[in-house]
Amino acid sequence: MADLAQHESARAPAEVLQPPGLPGLTRLIGKALGVVSRLTGKDRYDDFRLERVLGLQFLVTPTVFNPKLPRTGAFFADFIESHRLAAEAEVLDMGTGSGVCAIFAARHARRVVAVDINAAAVRCARLNAALNHVEHRSEVRHGDLFAPVAGERFDLILFNPPFLRGIPRDDRDRAWRSNDIAERFAAGVRDHLKPGGAALVLLSSFGGAGPFLEEFRRQGLLVSTVAERGFLTERLAIFRLEPLPDGGAA
């Protein structure tokens, strides 16, 4: 597998996602922008949309997470594309949505399995795999977290999780909030990685990164920052998770 930790940050993971600017002002601006985004982007969630990410086209169907409305999808895809995976790599894309990260991984890896709990997202990701000519190296499965890949191990796991704590209101809201995703994902990572494998998880300063980082360490995962990007009201970071040999807390 390609070395995806070549550009580790010197800062501690907990420091990376400190919101830019004054915290109170940042939260206020973020809430205002969130309202505007929901109002102006509603049609892009409720209708069929054709979006372009790094030169590739993606059909986004209703109730499926749109990779162009938040910044996360394009940021993660850009990282995957610029750190090309080894040709023999086997990859799991957790919570694939429209399939953006899975498809960019499948352009280079030998095999990609994508998983989503939203049945509409599963159908959407399959369409996009065919649209981008990687259906022969990718498979999309329906189910919750690691359930569809029980007993399987991968060189790399990708995850752009719901950042917010709470009960999702509908299928689309599952991409934004969950009460226990940090705990359940962290508990299952080790059992689904091959020796020498790693997971990449994208988190935002808008969400509660603390519970994720705490759970990763509690489950004996070494956490390092491999990419970060700052915006006016938000910071994004990609964290690399590696199981510690003794399984102890990091």
What is the predicted role of each segment?
Residues A77-G166:
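Conserved SAM/SAH cofactor-binding pocket of Class I
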Residues L69-G73, M94, N118, R177-A182:
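Short, conserved glycine- and acidic-residue-centered signature motifs
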Residues K31, R38-E90, M94-C101, C124, ...:
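SAM-dependent Rossmann-like transferase core, predominantly class I methyltransferases
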Residues A2-V53:
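N-terminal auxiliary segments of SAM/dcSAM-dependent transferases
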Residues A119-V122, V134, S138-P243:
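S-adenosylmethionine
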Residues Q6-P20, D46-F48, V113-D116, R123, ...:
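Short low-complexity stretches enriched in small and charged residues
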Residues T26-R27, L54, L59, I80, ...:
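A short alpha-helix capping/helix-coil boundary motif
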